[in-house]
């Protein structure tokens, strides 16, 4: 969710114009982008190049913040210019054209990983039938937690994502009883990723729905997930979905919904009804995660953002490096995944690779891909794969600049001279595609040439953050959903905007409404604020507050007491001297106080490595609930990547241990981190609905690329072939610095930097708080003989602060360019202790016969204090007889043995709070085979389940 709209390791806000090498997908986002094009139903002149004058447009804020936005997912504009927008947790909101937001419905949903409420579409006949469509994951009887990676029976995890039609009541509330199930897409639940879920209509009233490949990308090295092993969870094989002509996943579906909610198949889909081994609903196939798309109603063309995988480099044994695409789809077809990407030629075809370690076969034939997966239920030979309209990776498409890769919506503007709207876009922009990018945070117009190719690309004014969805409204204005900067949840930057064309007229003022309290018991006194409200022309504003309980005020910052329980929308309207107005809403809950949630540990900014077992503690409190039921407290792990996040796993409890899986999807130099999201939903009180509160902490990798800084002064980024990930921080001169946040450095005692210098060298100091803050340690950077010649320099750290800080690396030396910094590593305290490792059975971890040969069996045995049962724990290494405890593989049942110490991840064991010992290479637990406690029981690794045969006491 690669390159998702879900939050990651902050590239945003660096203030630099130089590219970030890595990609931004979701999961989520979450998220991923989608779109497809339909059979041409009419003709339209190609768009002519047009320079956009930013001063001619105004970005009007309609809603902002978590209370009004939730976790923003998708939007749809109604005929009255009000906007429906969804949140993943099942909440549906409506924001009026004036900017007043209210919750109009809640749909029960299953919310593991990226699933939940996704897309929304408005029936073309809404004015008379008031129908809308939602795509969501119904709860069903799916087990909680994660599905197993291996096994023989995954039936409990079978689920569906549902396309359903609903009716809005006259007051715009959602009539849940009106639900009609239109179509269900079978899914494999309990594992991430790729839901898709966007909805649109063409001029003929056909409904289009995008679906993701429902496949796990995290164990494929950043290449294609085509793991055909019969004991693997089906989610590791995208051939069963995106490459399957008889499956609705990884597709764009096209149907005609009938009045009774049934549907028919319009002509021109990829497979005619009745074709064996196919589904007639399929319009476009071979898609990984078509998260956002838009249909150009004038031509029937679909413009779709398609997310790709994350491999940093191409591989002769695996396939091409990761890339993403904007696709222009004008007729039914296959777009390649999981066999081909980009140009969909041999050069960008994947290799038929045998998991887990080869061999590699030949490259797939993009002209006639063959799906021979045992999970394929469709045709063996697939339609030829079509090339992407625009493919890009890193800085490969100059007009898109550089940075993370996360293509999103791409609506087409169509000028209507008869439309009386005063804010419609000009005729000069007719036919232009308004492409949006989540991670790079831009909107650009693309001219479409007469032959359908992409023409001139121009910047379009945008002052929000990460674009989640966009569509033109009936007024000819562009409506944009801004995800904000959170990870798997909304935040203060989440917003809904309307971008208006108003080249010479009086522009609308912006209203900002806030309150010192938004929930509590009656009587509830609230102090309201209009701080931040403004007029673009600088005119004096007048203020009008409607508190939602029948009372009003004209004060700029009034105080009001609510005397009765209820849900109230306090609306501020500001008016400028020319009579234009803007509005903002604050939601007030009287009778049910929002809970508080605190993560007591780990601290925000704590260091981790993939494979770690991370113990956590959460404190939740609620005024009305009193004693907290810890089974209602949740902790989720979100894999952060650039400016998005992939929701990976959730478990319940006020305390526990989160197992951070080994990441097998992203480039090792990618900008990754962990987000821990603690959540509690109260029980509701005094007739008022439940309220959910989230709190998040970020964990930082011990080894990090220097170019992933948060802020900097004076430096630049350079491509260097010998650098990790191919990038360094360079042009470093005396007094320059880079900074990172957040960091909690408890237990850190050493710092190592990878550096190069063909300049004069210098010193690098580790500081906290500011560029002139306390120095924890300083290293001397020598002249290495070349900018591509790297060496490691290290220093011990002292006076390390407690708590969460901002980390600064400051640079000093003579004149001119000093050195480059590629990456850095923090070392943590590693107390050494020796003794037996005792299982829950009371027996000891034993080296068979005291043998020292590589491969000697490690087993359970009655404790006897022998040398072959004495283990030395140093950090995460376990040694006996001068050799290391080693996992022979990564699959369930891989033997645990004695082996020459080599520093590999297979010899790295992380102790969990529940007594588990987790192997860093596989993320699996040390296990007494068959749950036996007999002498001689072989020790193996197995998927962690918390059983007694996976509990160990270290010396």
Annotate each language-model stretch with its function.
Residues 2-49:
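Secretory targeting and sorting signals
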Residues 529-537, 617-625, 756, 848, ...:
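Acidic, Ser/Thr
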């Amino acid at each position: 969710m690669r390159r998702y709209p879900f939050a990651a390791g902050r590239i945003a806000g660096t203030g630099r114009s130089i590219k970030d090498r890595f990609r931004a997908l979701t999961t989520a986002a979450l998220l991923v982008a989608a779109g497809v094009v339909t059979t041409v139903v009419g003709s339209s002149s190609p768009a002519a190049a047009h320079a956009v004058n930013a001063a001619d447009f105004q970005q009007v804020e309609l809603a902002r913040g978590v209370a009004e936005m939730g976790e923003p997912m998708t939007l749809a504009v109604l005929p009255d210019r009000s906007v429906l927008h969804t949140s993943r947790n099942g909440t549906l909101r409506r924001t009026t054209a004036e900017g007043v937001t209210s919750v109009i419905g809640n749909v029960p949903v299953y919310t593991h990983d990226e699933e939940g409420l996704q897309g929304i579409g408005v029936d073309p006949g809404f004015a008379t039938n008031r129908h809308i469509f939602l795509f969501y994951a119904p709860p069903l009887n799916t087990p909680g937690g994660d599905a197993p990676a291996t096994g023989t029976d995954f039936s409990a995890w079978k689920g569906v994502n549902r396309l359903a039609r609903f009716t809005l009541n006259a007051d715009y509330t959602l009539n849940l009883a009106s639900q009609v199930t239109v179509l269900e897409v079978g899914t494999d639940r309990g594992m991430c990723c790729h839901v898709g879920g966007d909805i649109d209509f063409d001029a003929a009233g056909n409904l289009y729905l995008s679906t993701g490949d429902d496949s796990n990308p995290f164990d494929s090295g950043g290449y294609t997930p085509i793991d055909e092993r019969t004991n693997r969870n089906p989610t590791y094989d995208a051939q069963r979905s995106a490459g399957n002509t008889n499956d609705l996943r990884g597709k764009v579906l096209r149907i005609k919904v009938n009045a009774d909610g049934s549907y028919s198949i319009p002509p021109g889909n990829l497979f005619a009804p009745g074709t064996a081994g196919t589904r007639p609903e399929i319009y476009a196939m071979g898609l990984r995660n078509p998260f956002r798309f838009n249909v150009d109603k004038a031509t029937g063309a679909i413009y779709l953002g398609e997310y790709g995988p994350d491999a940093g480099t191409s591989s002769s044994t695996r396939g091409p490096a990761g890339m993403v695409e904007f696709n222009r789809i004008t007729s039914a077809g296959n777009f390649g995944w999981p066999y081909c990407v980009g140009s969909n030629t041999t050069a960008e075809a994947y290799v038929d690779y045998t998991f887990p370690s080869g061999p590699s076969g030949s490259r797939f034939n993009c002209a006639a891909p063959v799906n021979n997966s045992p999970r394929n239920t469709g045709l063996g030979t697939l339609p030829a794969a079509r090339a992407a309209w625009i493919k890009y990776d890193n800085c490969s498409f100059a007009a898109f600049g550089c940075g993370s890769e996360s293509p999103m919506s791409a609506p087409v503007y169509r000028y209507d001279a008869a439309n009386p709207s005063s804010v419609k876009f000009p005729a000069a922009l007719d036919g232009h595609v308004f492409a949006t990018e989540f991670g790079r945070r831009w909107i650009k117009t693309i001219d479409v040439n007469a032959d359908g190719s992409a023409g001139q690309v121009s910047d379009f004014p945008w002052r929000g953050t990460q674009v989640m969805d966009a569509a033109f409204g009936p007024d000819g204005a562009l409506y944009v959903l801004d995800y904000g900067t959170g990870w798997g949840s909304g935040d203060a930057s989440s917003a809904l905007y309307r971008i208006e064309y108003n080249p010479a007229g009086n522009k609308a003022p912006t209203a900002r409404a806030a309150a010192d309290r938004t929930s509590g018991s009656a009587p509830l006194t609230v102090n309201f604020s209009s701080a931040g409200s403004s007029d673009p022309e600088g005119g004096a504003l007048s203020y009008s507050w409607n508190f939602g309980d029948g009372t009003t005020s004209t004060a700029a910052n009034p105080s009001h007491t609510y005397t009765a329980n209820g849900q109230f929308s306090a609306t501020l309207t500001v008016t400028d001297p020319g009579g234009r107005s803007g509005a903002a809403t604050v939601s007030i809950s009287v009778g049910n106080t929002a809970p508080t949630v605190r993560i007591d540990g780990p601290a925000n900014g704590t260091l981790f490595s993939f494979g770690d077992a991370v113990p956590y503690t959460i404190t939740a409190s609620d005024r009305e609930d009193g004693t907290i039921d810890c089974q209602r407290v949740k902790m989720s792990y979100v894999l952060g990547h650039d400016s998005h996040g992939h929701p990976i796993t959730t478990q319940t409890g006020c305390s526990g241990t989160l197992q951070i899986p080994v990441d097998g999807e992203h480039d090792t130099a990618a900008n990754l981190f962990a987000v821990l999201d603690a959540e509690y939903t109260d029980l509701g009180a005094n007739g008022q609905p439940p309220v959910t509160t989230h709190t998040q902490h970020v964990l930082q990798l011990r080894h990090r690329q220097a170019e992933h800084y948060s802020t900097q002064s004076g430096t630049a980024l350079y491509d260097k072939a010998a650098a990790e990930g191919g990038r360094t921080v360079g042009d470093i001169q005396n007094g320059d610095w880079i900074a990172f946040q957040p960091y909690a450095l408890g237990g850190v005692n050493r710092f190592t930097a990878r550096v190069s210098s063909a300049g004069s060298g210098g010193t690098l100091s580790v500081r906290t708080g500011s560029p002139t803050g306390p120095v924890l340690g300083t290293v001397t950077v020598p002249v290495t003989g070349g900018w591509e010649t790297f060496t490691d320099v290290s220093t011990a750290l002292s006076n390390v602060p407690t708590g969460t800080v901002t980390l600064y690396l400051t640079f000093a030396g003579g004149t001119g360019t000093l050195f480059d910094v590629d990456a850095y590593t923090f070392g943590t305290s590693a107390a050494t202790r020796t003794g037996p490792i005792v299982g829950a059975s009371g027996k000891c971890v034993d080296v068979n016969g005291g043998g020292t040969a590589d491969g000697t069996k490690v087993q359970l045995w009655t404790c006897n204090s022998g040398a072959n049962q004495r283990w030395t724990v140093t950090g995460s290494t376990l040694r006996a007889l001068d050799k290391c405890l080693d996992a022979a593989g990564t699959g369930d049942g891989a033997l645990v043995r004695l082996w020459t110490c080599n520093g590999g991840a297979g010899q790295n064991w992380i102790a969990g709070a529940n007594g588990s010992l987790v192997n860093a290479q596989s993320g699996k637990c040390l296990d007494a085979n068959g749950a036996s406690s007999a002498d001689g029981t072989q020790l193996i690794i197995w998927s962690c389940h918390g059983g007694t045969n996976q509990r160990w006491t270290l010396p």
